[in-house]
Structure formats: structure tokens, C-alpha cells
Amino acid sequence: MDEADRQLLRRCRVRLVSELQVAELWDALLSRELFTRDMIEDIQQAGSGSRRDQARQLVTDLETRGRQALPLFISCLEDTGQGTLASLLQSGRQAAKQDPEAVKPLDHLVPVVLGPMGLTAKEQRVVKLDPSQPAVGNLTPVVLGPEELWPARLKPEVLRPETPRPVDIGSGGAHDVCVPGKIRGHADMAYTLDSDPCGHCLIINNVNFCPSSGLGTRTGSNLDRDKLEHRFRWLRFMVEVKNDLTAKKMVTALMEMAHRNHRALDCFVVVILSHGCQASHLQFPGAVYGTDGCSVSIEKIVNIFNGSGCPSLGGKPKLFFIQACGGEQKDHGFEVACTSSQGRTLDSDSEPDAVPYQEGPRPLDQLDAVSSLPTPSDILVSYSTFPGFVSWRDKKSGSWYIETLDGILEQWARSEDLQSLLLRVANAVSAKGTYKQIPGCFNFLRKKLFFKTS
């Protein structure tokens, strides 16, 4: 959906929720393929199932339905005798077209500079946010997406400089700042990964999509799959790989894994390699596509393994690694003076796992209307990119994120905890390419996590 249409919906949200007669809209929404029948059933079950709750969820989900979603919704209102609301939205669209400057973009990037990360001299950067402002040395930049993508109660745990690192590499050597061996021995400071194998790892790799989906072949993804299959076996996981699953089969595979008995194991990992998109959410943003072109929200995937869905994983770390686009924006970054040689230009073999909305509405996004995990714990969801932005994949070497994650795990998993490893991944990936990419994560782990490497 265009930013102007999205803003208009949000400005009119209170009135729409108050006056919208949703019961009369279902057939019209189906006939115009704005939503599938399953999606409408999810909307009807939102909250208490009241008209207001349904209207509220409908307006929220409408933002994910493509560039033509709002004009089609307006025509649905006209066909169901809700002309007053249709006129309200139509006049708002016309006003925005006549005066585009009146609509302040919500996707304006906000550069946020975090403190020193203990980088080596070669990795140090000088970040210049504004030509009129003095440069700031030895800082690591993070480009955050739209503020509204991160609910106030759920600020993502991305690159937190205040978190103690188990190994300080500031001068190129290891210093006993926070010795991993000492932390590993304390159950109140680090998760216990004593079992061997330490847990299951499910890798879902979607490469070939049906022609009707409009989604391209994800050349290079098999390289990502093979790297992570090898890496997590090395980390003492029992790895299972599923290739080219439809959305329904993805959910089935995840639920089958959740129904297993994990009581004798200490950890659990899910890796999903696919195309992705934005999706309405309460906690975890984004969605991934099955090979049939239907999507499954990350929130739904995570909630399959919550306390009620998988009690045998209660209190144990559950890790989700998502290699997929969070949207269609390409991040050009901002000016940096960098001494690192890690950057590389974007060539013809690099392509995004993005799904543009320019083809009109798709009956795709399946949304989890009601979250069953209000206070998530022992969960970490690592995204290859921030919501709203593309995630780059090289046809010859695989995705930037997975290639870097594999290398960091190989080099540092013996000595550093997971959060420190992900900081390294974010720093390395952000240095790549003409277009920029910055991984991030939602971290609800209660302790440090050190992988089992021997």
C-alpha cells in the first residue's frame, strides 16, 4: 500500500472503527479478492468478535493488501451502501494527490548511532549523519525503519551496546572482560546446553514457487540451506530439512515439530529461507511465503512454540532465523568513511527476497489476529533485515545474512554468546553492497546462550 493511503487509513481509523458495518462487506471483499475466506474468518474472530473488534482488525489488515487495496475497499463501501465512509476516504485520496507534501512519509529513515562495540581498528567507522554536524568517531551506525513498525511495548533487542560482551576484541586480542567459561557454569546467567544432541533444528527452504504466485526462483538459497545444515550439526543439533513447502505444509511441519517431546533436549531452532513481506502484527513483524504464494506470519510461526503449543520447550531457548525480505524498500544507507575492506558493490547476481506490491492486491497474507503469547520468554527471532526493507541474496554465494551468520558461528561460537555473535553479523552485513542491509532481532531470552561446539 502507498504511504499516502496508509496514512489516510490511520487518520480515519477512529471513524472507520466506529461506523464501519463489517457484516455487509465480507462478500464484496471476497469478490474483489482483497482477502481470502480464511483471512476473513480470522478477522471475524478478532478480539471478542464484536463489530468494533472486527472493524479494527479489518482496517489494520487492509494495509498489507497491496497498492490497490484502498481504492478497492472504497468500491466495496460504495456497493454496500456505506457511501459516507467511501466519500471520506475518496476525498482524502484526492487531497493527497493534489498536495503530496501534506502527507509526511512514515518511511523516512532515522539514523541511530550506538556506542562503541569493541571493534578492531580495521572495523572502526566514522559516521557522518549531517554535513553540517561534526563526525563522530568509533561508532557503529544502525538505520532503523519506520517507528510505528516497533510497538512501544516491544522495542527490538537490536545491537544493544550496554550488554556485556563475553570477549572484548577492541585491541584485536581476547581479554577476560566476561569469561564465557565462568558464565556457562552459572545456571542463572546462561542457559544450560548439556544434552547431546542439544535439540532439534528445522530448516525450511523455499526455492521454487508456482507460476501463479508471481514469485521468482530463489537461486542461491540451496547454498544457504547446505551451510546452515552443516553448521547446526556442528553445533550439536539434530537437523531436518524441508524443501519447497506450501504455506499449509509449512504450518504442518512446524506443528509436527511442536508436538514432539523436547523434555530431554535443551534448545530448539527454526530457520526459514523464503520470500517475505510485511504483515500486520502484535509482536513479531513480517511474514514468509510458501511455494503456493500464500504467506504465514512470523508471529504465527513463533506462537506455535509458545507455552501452550509446546510445553516441553518451556523455559528453554527457542531461536528463529528468518532469511526473507521485510518489505520492498531499498536502503541506500548514509555517508560513512570506512577503513574496512568488507564492503562490496551490488552486481547482477544479487537480488532481493522482496515482494513488491505494484501488481495489485493478492489474496496472500494470512494474519494471526489474536496473539497467544502476550509475554514471550526464551524466544529470539533474528531477521535478515529490518521490516520494510529488502534482504539481499547472491545467486552464486547465497544470501548476505546467511553467508555472514555461518562464518561468524564458525569463527566465534566457541567463545561468544549468541547476542554477541549477532552483533558481529549485523556489523559485517551492514558493510556490504551498494544498497544497505542491517539485520536485527527481537530478543526475549532471559539468559546468555552459548552454543555447544564440542
Swiss-Prot record:
Organism superkingdom: Eukaryota
Activity regulation (UniProt): Inhibited by BIRC6; following inhibition of BIRC6-caspase binding by DIABLO/SMAC, BIRC6 is subjected to caspase cleavage, leading to an increase in active caspases.
Top-rank EC class of the record's enzyme: hydrolase
Sequence positions bearing Phosphothreonine: T163
InterPro entries the UniProt entry points to: CARD, CARD_CASP9, Caspase-like_dom_sf, Caspase_cys_AS, Caspase_his_AS, DEATH-like_dom_sf, Pept_C14, Pept_C14_caspase
CARD domain residues: 1-92
Catalyzed chemical reaction(s): Strict requirement for an Asp residue at position P1 and with a marked preference for His at position P2. It has a preferred cleavage sequence of Leu-Gly-His-Asp-|-Xaa
Keyword Acyltransferase: no
Residue ranges listed under propeptide: 354-367
Phosphotyrosine sites (modified residues): Y191
Positions bearing Phosphoserine: S340, S348
Cellular component GO terms held in the UniProt record: apoptosome; caspase complex; cytosol; mitochondrion; nucleus
Record-annotated active site: H275, C325
Pfam families: CARD, Peptidase_C14
Cited SMART domains: CARD, CASc
Example of a GO biological process term: cellular response to UV
EC number of this enzyme: 3.4.22.62
PTM comment text: Cleavages at Asp-353 by granzyme B and at Asp-368 by caspase-3 generate the two active subunits. Caspase-8 and -10 can also be involved in these processing events.
Alphabetized GO MF terms: cysteine-type endopeptidase activity; peptidase activity; protein kinase binding; SH3 domain binding
UniProt keywords, alphabetically: Apoptosis, Hydrolase, Phosphoprotein, Protease, Thiol protease, Ubl conjugation, Zymogen
Coiled coil location: none
Main function: Involved in the activation cascade of caspases responsible for apoptosis execution. Binding of caspase-9 to Apaf-1 leads to activation of the protease which then cleaves and activates effector caspases caspase-3 (CASP3) or caspase-7 (CASP7). Promotes DNA damage-induced apoptosis in a ABL1/c-Abl-dependent manner. Proteolytically cleaves poly(ADP-ribose) polymerase (PARP). Cleaves BIRC6 following inhibition of BIRC6-caspase binding by DIABLO/SMAC.
Record note on quaternary structure: Heterotetramer that consists of two anti-parallel arranged heterodimers, each one formed by a 35 kDa (p35) and a 10 kDa (p10) subunit. Caspase-9 and APAF1 bind to each other via their respective NH2-terminal CED-3 homologous domains in the presence of cytochrome C and ATP. Interacts (inactive form) with EFHD2. Interacts with HAX1. Interacts with BIRC2/c-IAP1, XIAP/BIRC4, BIRC5/survivin, BIRC6/bruce and BIRC7/livin. Interacts with ABL1 (via SH3 domain); the interaction is direct and increased in the response of cells to genotoxic stress and ABL1/c-Abl activation. Interacts with BCL2L10.
Family note: Belongs to the peptidase C14A family.
Protein name: Caspase-9
